Curated annotation (Swiss-Prot):
Keywords noted in UniProt: Actin-binding, Cytoplasm, Elongation factor, GTP-binding, Nucleotide-binding, Protein biosynthesis
Organism superkingdom: Eukaryota
Taxonomic lineage: Eukaryota, Fungi, Fungi incertae sedis, Microsporidia, Unikaryonidae
Gene that this polypeptide is encoded by: TEF1
Cellular component, GO annotation: cytoplasm
Protein name: Elongation factor 1-alpha
Region (G2): 75-79
MF GO annotations: actin binding; GTP binding; GTPase activity; translation elongation factor activity
Keyword flag Protein biosynthesis: yes
Pathway info: Protein biosynthesis; polypeptide chain elongation
Amino acid sequence: MATKVEDDSKPRLNACFIGHVDSGKSTTVGMLSYQLGAVDKREMEKYEKEAALNNKETFYLAYLTDKTDAERKRGITITTTLVNLPTEKFNINILDCPGHKDFVKNMVTGASQADVAVVIVPASGFESCVGVGGMLKTHIMISGILGCEKLIVCVNKMDEIPENKRMEKFNEVSAEMLRIVKRSHKDKNPIIIPISAFKGINLTKKGEKFEWFKGWKEKEGSSVIYTLEEALNYQDVPERHNDKPLRMPITKVCSIAGVGKIFTGRVEYGTITPNLKITIQPAGVVGETRSVEIHNKPRSMIPCGENCGVALKGGVIGEIDKVDAGHVISANDENKAVAYPGAKIRTIVVGRPKGLSPGYTPQINFGNCHSPGRIAKILSKVVGKEVHENPENVANGENFTGIVVFQKPLVIDKMERFQNLAKFALMDSNGVVGIGNVMEPLTRDQLLKDYGIDLNEDPKAAKKAASKKKA
């Protein structure tokens, strides 16, 4: 693939593309990459031929990111794919996330590495994205939980709307998107623009535009945004915590002949260098880095906010084959990461009409680190201005403080130390049922001493005994 040479002097921005299945996320990434020169005409012609062989002629733009046979034959994104895209202002890591409800975990992996979320919604078929079974609202909520503080909303497939109705349809979808975003995300004034990914309209400054669209601007006197390229360049790079101890959650483990295992992920805190003594938790592996790379280019140091690959030297202590996605790399010193079996949490219940009670075991997601998590105790909940101690149930919309026990130890921390390792989503049947953060990670001894939770005891038997005692 012929690409522009990356300018290392430009800051890095990480952008995830999210939205319901068939909204055109991969097509948008493909056409944007082509128009900005990150992929050449010959490569696109190759994708056209491959798409034709799969009887998916209109999907060829998506082949830049949809690389597996399963993705190409089904016409959907399954894994999160990383594409490097240089713009006038940034070197952008584009993370193309799956929209299908069966692959929410993969979407979470992509969103957990991003600074900004690009939400792709179709002008035609918008109702299916926000109706029963639609994943749009869930994606927006998850992106906010995982730290994407800014949104760019692209109303796609505008070319499929009759020309005399495009402005009306765009305004209608924009109003509904504003309503959805205000209810589920921190960014109350997202950039909203119309695009046609397949036709390449409103993607780049030099490309074709919708003449009826007069642009988006944050406030009077600020820049007017017409295209996705301008919307990306309008972003500010979030604060990077290079001065903090190293924390790098692993997103993927690859085995390369002659090299060994490569661990990829984003440096959430601190920096990582070659010849650094590290530990990987909860696997319990200890080793030393041999090389660190960005897009296959060796670096002397990887700063916070970068996605990279890490290779280790020989002589690793521990079972390296047990290292998996969701494990965390840190320096092997007094500030190393620790895996905990449980935590004291503060949570708001959302999207669960019947509420929740002790014993409920949803999936708990800390970015791409996840495990079933049993709500072992509900210590208190807030109803209006009143605090109720030891309630039997927490209703939808109520806040509670409780104790969660993980099925397997997870690397977590307090908000004030590493907030990206403290924020989580509770999920059930691919839907978000709770949003919260860690007040205090708890060791096995703390769970027993402070809360009477014995991890050696069968939780079902304990619950049954407690019920008999109460009776």
